[in-house]
Amino acid sequence: MALLPILEFPDPRLRTKAVPVDAAEVVSPAFQTLLDDMFQTMYEAPGIGLAASQVDVHKRFMVIDVSEEKDAPQVFINPEIVTRQGEQVYQEGCLSVPGIFADVSRADAITVRYLDRQGQPQELSTDGLLAVCIQHEMDHLDGKLFVDYLSPLKREMVRKKLAKLRKHVA
């Protein structure tokens, strides 16, 4: 397994809309290795979700593990939200926008259809943190970031703060 570089805002590649994964590709050794690498990258970061777009692979899949023990890895390939209910506000962060957190309003409960790691069709109804994480990662697949939900002024403040943080690291 290998750690993958995570793209950071405002990298324009984060705005690329991902294309569907071919069902035959899902079971290939290369794709399975990529999933393993994404999980390792997510856990090391540390994070609870990682979309392929964040590691410069512009295909519609993501890995998630919202468990405290980090022992419940989930793969969502070609995810599609089929129902949304209610509304909730969560403070979100993002591995592509390190050190920044903001309140984002999302559906409280969702039902999502997707292919699992073995390429089998699944449907999951969920709420709470997992629902938020799925919606957040799916935004990445559409070239959208959680900072897009902020006002232009706040978004510019985030961009400047990240630039300042990068200067201190360099």
UniProtKB/Swiss-Prot annotation:
Domain of life of the source: Bacteria
Any GO BP: translation
Keyword list, A-Z: Hydrolase, Iron, Metal-binding, Protein biosynthesis
The record's free-text note on cofactor binding: Binds 1 Fe(2+) ion.
Enzyme Commission code: 3.5.1.88
Protein family (similarity comment): Belongs to the polypeptide deformylase family.
Record protein name field: Peptide deformylase 2
Organism (species): Xanthomonas campestris pv. campestris (strain ATCC 33913 / DSM 3586 / NCPPB 528 / LMG 568 / P 25)
Gene: def2
